[in-house]
Amino acid sequence: SLRGGAAGGGTRMRKGLDKNEVLSLAKTMEVKFTVSGPAIGGAKSGINFDPKDPRKEGVLKRWFAAVSPLLKNYYGTGGDLNVDEIHEVIPITEESGVWHPQEGVFTGHFTPTEADKINRIGQLRQGVVKIIENVNFSPDVVRKYTVADMITGYGVSESINHYYRLYGG
């Protein structure tokens, strides 16, 4: 769904993935953004392909090249099941001319000036791949976790905490 000029949701890949699963996930993203913001629509990219197949990279390159006009203007994506944001989504979308996989959300929802877009997307590009070096913000600085790793990990850990608050354990 397109809302507030944009929509967001990750890109997943698995053998047997079908349209109904992708639509359901997109609806879930719509609810997520309605509750937590920003006020945008929900989306999801789904690729019915075995992620263990050695042709995976080529499939992702063709997919992101095909959707790059959307990613430049109103769709934002990231990693999801079997698709890594740092090692696959960011570099492959960049090869397709997309500054960052969230460029479309920023462009469509905020309608920035070109200068503001360059500045903000530049900050985003540097921020999510930044390796956390401060022991106060990383469980293990030797493992070289990125900001993106910690954001994902925080969401997972909060979900687990919530489950235990509801059901004990």
Name every feature range the model reports, one short phrase each.
Residues 1-31:
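N-terminal cap/recognition module
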Residues 34-168:
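Glycine/serine-rich phosphate-binding loop and adjoining beta1-alpha1 elements at the start
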